[in-house]
Curated annotation (Swiss-Prot):
This is Imidazole glycerol phosphate synthase subunit HisF. GO terms for molecular function: imidazoleglycerol-phosphate synthase activity; lyase activity. Keywords: Amino-acid biosynthesis, Cytoplasm, Histidine biosynthesis, Lyase. Its main location: cytoplasm. The gene is hisF. The active site is at D11, D130. PANTHER family: IMIDAZOLE GLYCEROL PHOSPHATE SYNTHASE HISHF, IMIDAZOLE GLYCEROL PHOSPHATE SYNTHASE SUBUNIT HISF/H IGP SYNTHASE SUBUNIT HISF/H. InterPro entries: Aldolase_TIM (IPR013785), His_biosynth (IPR006062), HisF (IPR004651), IGPS_HisA/HisF (IPR050064), RibuloseP-bd_barrel (IPR011060). The keyword Repressor does not apply. Transmembrane segments: none annotated. Pathway: Amino-acid biosynthesis; L-histidine biosynthesis; L-histidine from 5-phospho-alpha-D-ribose 1-diphosphate: step 5/9. It is found in: Cytoplasm.
Length: 258
């Protein structure tokens, strides 16, 4: 069995790490490189960086910090933000990123997933899915351009359908960003994760809602996700990654202990 992964997420805007609640009202957390270094030293398995306004601004991720991160950490990291072409992806990978993640650009042009996978291999192509639960309809819908609340829109895709579509097109991994849970720290949406897990045959990463060590355990044990991504609990030092991994190991979770 592959070890489960603990993945800190760093949302980047204007060269700094920020964090919002339900993708809104972002506050500045700190500088990118020192945070990345700290998480690597604490025992993170990999890092994910989202340039959250790149797609909505119509630009690609700011590449200047990518190479600086690569210089100070020795764990894999993934970069997302406005990657709309093979050239965009090639540049980011050449600066040291191990994976690239696409979200809104994939919704605008689903063939991008296949072209990236064919060029760089499925192992480094991640598709991020921003999913919102509609309490009135009881359905999960995919959202686009979520980095800018003035441009965020609900797409025609239901989440389970889009999960299956991106796999057909070559996604090597899926990060499910559960917007309702984002930043509120009351647990991952286990019901949604279980439904997605049934149709997801590539590595699945849970994102949105972690507030306690037990929340990570529930995602691994009850929804069988491959990785758990979190931001605010790590940024605010509510949970230490090393202590989290030690706890998970005592609960029988296969995890890499540093």
């Amino acid at each position: 069995m592959l070890a489960k992964r603990i993945i800190p997420c760093l949302d980047v805007r204007d060269g700094q790490v920020v964090k919002g609640v339900q993708f809104r009202n972002h506050e500045i957390i700190g500088d990118i490189v020192p945070l990345a270094k700290r998480y690597a030293e604490e025992g993170a398995d990999e890092l994910v960086f989202y340039d959250i306004t790149a797609s909505s601004d119509g630009r690609v991720v700011d590449k200047s910090w990518v190479s600086r991160v690569a210089e100070v950490i020795d764990i894999p990291f993934c970069v997302a933000g406005g990657i709309k072409s093979l050239d965009d992806a090639a540049k980011i990978l050449s600066f040291g990123a191990d994976k690239i993640s696409i979200n809104s650009p994939a919704l605008a042009d689903p063939t991008l997933i296949t072209r990236l996978a064919d060029r760089f291999g499925v192992q480094c192509i991640v598709v991020g899915i921003d999913t919102w639960y509609d309490g009135e309809t009881g359905k999960y819908h995919v959202n686009q351009y979520t980095g800018d609340e003035s441009r965020t829109r609900v797409t025609q895709w239901e989440t389970l359908d889009w999960v299956q579509e991106v796999q057909k097109r070559g996604a090597g991994e899926i990060v499910l960003n559960m917007m309702n849970q984002d930043g509120v720290r009351n647990g991952y949406d286990l019901e949604q994760l279980k439904k997605v897990r049934e149709v997801c045959h590539v590595p699945l990463i849970a994102s949105g809602g972690a507030g306690t060590m037990e929340h990570f355990l529930e995602a691994f044990r009850d929804a069988d996700v491959d990785g758990a991504l979190a931001a605010s609990v790590f940024h605010k030092q509510i949970i230490n990654i090393g202590e989290l991994k030690a706890y998970l190991a005592t609960q029988g979770v296969e995890i890499r202990i540093c």
